[in-house]
Regions:
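Conserved alpha-helical positions within TPR/SEL1-like repeat arrays
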Residues: 1-13, 44-59, 90-105
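Residue signature of alpha-solenoid helical repeat architecture, marking inter-repeat boundaries
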Residues: 37-44, 83-90
């Protein structure tokens, strides 16, 4: 699943949005399944994939999808930050910043 995620990032960075969407979809499906069995290990991967999916959807002007993904990512990251603020508060702040930018550009 990390290979799918990395491949999706490559496609996103090279503006191959359709391929990036396919890879993020697959990575998210795998991470969600893994998080069901072991949330303490994989929830952060779900949040990170949702966050990057939101960037993709924002870049492709699908703002409603991006908002949903940022919001879900933020919920997960806030939960993680409650348990380990040092490790996850920066992720919460970054997600809030991107969500604010999305609302500004909508």
């Amino acid at each position: 699943s990390s290979a799918k995620f990395n491949l999706a990032n490559l496609h996103l960075n090279t503006k191959r949005f359709d391929l990036a969407e396919e890879e993020y979809t697959e990575a998210l499906r795998i991470y969600r399944r893994l998080a069901e069995r072991n949330p303490s290990v994989y929830e952060s991967d779900v949040a990170m994939t949702l966050y990057n999916f939101a960037i993709l959807h924002s870049d492709t002007k699908r703002f409603d999808l991006a908002e949903e993904e940022y919001t879900e990512s933020l919920e997960i990251r806030r939960r993680l930050a409650e348990r380990d603020p040092y490790a996850f508060e920066n992720d919460v702040a970054t997600t809030l910043n991107n969500l604010a930018n999305l609302h500004q550009n909508k």
